[in-house]
Amino acid sequence: MKINILLNNNYFSDHCTFSFIYPIIKSISLIRESGVKISFIHSISNSIFDCNTLIIDSRFCGKLKKKTEFINYLKKKKTKEYKLIFADTADNSGQLKTDFLSFVDIYWKGQILKNVNEYMNPHYGGRLFTNFYKKRFNIQDKNKQISEPVKNKDLLNKIQICWNMGLCDHGRYAHIKQKLYSIFKFNFFINNTKNFFLPDKKRNRNISCRIGTKYERETVSFQRIKISELLEKYIDTSKLSRFKYLNELSNSKYIISPFGWGELCPRDFETFINGGLLIKPDMKTINTWPNWYVSNKTYLSFDWDLINFRNKVKIALKNYKKLKEIAVNAQREYLYYTVGKESKQIFTERFLNLIKK
C-alpha cells in the first residue's frame, strides 16, 4: 500500500501540522514493516495521485492562494482507484471545512464534537464554546466569524477521529528538538521526553495558571480574561519565560488550563509530564483520541460559565492528598501512549485501521 501525504514543506514550524505528522514519523519503521510506504509531498502535481491513499493536511490548503481551483482539481482527478482523506489538523473541535467534507472520502479530525449533529448548526466564533459565550454573555467579536453548517446529514458519516496533539513531544526541550529537526531532518529528534516529575514530588506552590489573554476574537479571550480576574487576588497569571514556566509547573499541585483557539492546549500535556493535577473547562462535549480527559479521573472540570470555578478550586486545595491520585492516573495514561513499550505499536495499529476504514 502506498500513502501520499500532502503538506507544507515547513510543517515543522506549524504546531498543528507538526503535532499531526509527529507520531507518523516516530512510528514510520513499524508502518513500513506492515507493507505501507509513506511519501511526504509538498507541491501540487499529478504525482500526488500515484498512491492508494492521499491524505491532505488542512494547513496546506489554508495557505493556498487559489484554493477553489485546487478543490476543482481534486474533484476532477478523484476516482475510486484511491482513497482521499482530508486531515483537519486544527486544535479545536469546530469549524469543519465543509468545502472539502462535501467530496472527500474521509474527514479526519483530532477532536470532534460528541454530538456530531451540532455541526449542522452555525457556531458564532466557529466553536461550540465561543457560541456558548455569545449566547450566555452576549460577547461580541469585532472580527465576526460564524462556522459554515453541514447541510447534508449523511456527510457527518465521513467524520472520523484520528489523533490529537498530545502524541507530540511536550517535554522541556521539545522546542529545541523541533528546531534541530527542521534543520537536519533526522528522525533521531522525533522522540517523546522520558524526563518527568512524579505527582508525589514535593510541591511548594498550590496553583499555576500562566496564560495569555489577548486574542483576535473576544469570544476566545473571554474565558481566559475571566479566569485571570477570578485568580488575581491569589496568584500572578502573567506569562513567564519557558524554563521559568516549566519550573513553576513542576513545583505546583494544580495547573489551570483554559481553552485557547482550541479546547486542547500544550499546557495540558506539560501538566501530565510535570505531575501536576489538571484543572480545565469541562471537556464532556468532545471525543478525541487518546482520550486524556475523563472528569475526576484524569482531570478536574469546571463549568464553562465559570460560576463554580472558585468553589471547585477551593475544594481542590483542601483535598489535595485525596485528589492527587487523579494526577497519577493522568500521568500514567500519558506515558502509556507516548513512551510506553507498546506506544509505537498502538499508534501504528490505529493509523492502519483508520486507513483501511
List each model region and its residues:
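Catalytic binding pocket for nucleotide-activated donors in carbohydrate/polymer assembly enzymes
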Residues: 239-357
